[in-house]
């Protein structure tokens, strides 16, 4: 089994009393594609509602903030901020926190679902959006790969994006958010990059992650093999998005595509564990 440098073996749960992943060895050793073992797709399970916090690094500084009609924004101490006063308060407040909930918001030119916190430190305000993991994955899939790509390639991307996100749930980038929204992590563009195709790929792989030796795979990926060699070569195995598209057109399902790029990994599905 390949030595996978840069892959994590971290606890899956923010709530270890409830959340477990079915991390048994799910490799199908009788099914191979070339020299690659095809990971077996785990059985279906109910949706596991996990929240992820994304730092909207690309949207700082905030030049426009428009809450939806049902959104309520408050300072950390509880005082409500009228919608028409928000940008004035953002421009004038020295250091504070603003929390908005109750519906979608527009930040600069992009729309986001979920609760939004505006954090002010020594520099510009940083928006942090808190949303369901699966909603997040659907946006990442649409931002990282064109929706015109083959459905199986998009499913492989969904699993890779979910696994990467889970690794950062276990090991957050900062105390304020789990990961950012740029290529430094994986691209997240809110509603702008969420499409019917990205939703379908996310739904059809709901809760599936890559696992290795009982831990989460920090599933690195890049647009093509050259970028992988230049950027990820020292970190272990990575998925080529253009290569995944080619393999999908050759007839490989998403799990076989993942088996090609993450040798030795198995697929597991997030489930609740009742005590």
Where in this protein do the model-derived segments appear?
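Conserved, single-site charged/polar hotspot
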Residues: 1-275
């Amino acid at each position: 089994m390949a030595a996978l440098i840069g892959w994590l073996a971290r606890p899956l749960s923010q709530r270890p009393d409830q959340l477990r992943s079915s991390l048994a060895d799910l490799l199908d050793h009788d099914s191979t594609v070339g020299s690659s073992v095809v990971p077996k797709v785990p059985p279906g399970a109910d949706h596991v509602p996990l929240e992820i916090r994304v730092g909207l690094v690309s949207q700082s500084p905030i030049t426009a903030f428009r809450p939806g009609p049902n959104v309520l924004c408050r300072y950390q101490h509880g005082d409500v901020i009228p919608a028409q006063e928000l940008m004035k308060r953002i421009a004038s407040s020295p250091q504070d926190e603003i929390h908005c909930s109750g519906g979608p918001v527009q930040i600069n030119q992009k729309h986001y679902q979920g609760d939004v916190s505006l954090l002010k430190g020594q520099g510009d305000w940083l928006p942090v959006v808190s949303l369901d993991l699966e909603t997040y994955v659907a946006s990442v899939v649409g931002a990282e790969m064109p929706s015109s790509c083959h459905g199986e390639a998009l499913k492989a991307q969904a699993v890779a994006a979910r696994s990467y996100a889970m690794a950062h749930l276990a090991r957050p980038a900062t105390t304020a958010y789990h990961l950012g929204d740029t290529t430094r992590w994986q691209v997240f563009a809110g509603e702008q990059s969420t499409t019917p195709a990205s939703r379908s790929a996310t739904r059809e792989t709901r809760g599936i992650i890559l696992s290795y030796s009982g831990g989460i795979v920090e599933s690195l990926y890049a647009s093509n093999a050259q970028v992988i060699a230049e950027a990820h070569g020292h970190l272990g195995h990575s998925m080529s998005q253009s290569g995944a598209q080619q393999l999908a057109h050759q007839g490989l399902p998403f799990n076989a595509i993942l088996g090609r790029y993450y040798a030795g990994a198995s697929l597991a599905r997030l489930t609740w564990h009742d005590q």
